[in-house]
């Protein structure tokens, strides 16, 4: 059995009380295969609604998706036994929001939406493979480093927000550049770093889910 990190994921739906509370409502046991299958179905639903929104070019779905998704997320966090029913609807609403946001960004930076889709699938698949093959392990040091990097990024964005309020411009390494013009290489490098750190947070979720399967947590 693999040794798991004692640090927990920052996902509020995967807190330390998740399995404890769920055990009161069901005797069915979760499996890694079942979790992956349901995650795949949810991702498929998300992609379908996102594709619909993107092809119809209806940005009004952004507010519907964000508000509806936020409400369902809160319901799922506090009523975890409802997760099998709320998850598909949450995925559909998030797809509406992401599709609308993709329309906005694709109008400013043509082709960026398609790149984001391929990167999302690629990163998720690569990280899942790396975790299962133990190329990446959710150790204590890994968690500490990830928390430090994530916190540093958050502080950088807060500073950038304050600077933009006062000066009307962004920090140089966060400059996107004008539409149609290339962004500074340091900005591109910082963006890649942020994507990598954000993606590595998925490893903590993988570790938490696998631990639940190993201890026979409820479905």
Regions found by a protein language model. Name each.
Residues 1-219:
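A hydrophobic alpha-helical transmembrane-helix feature that marks the membrane cores
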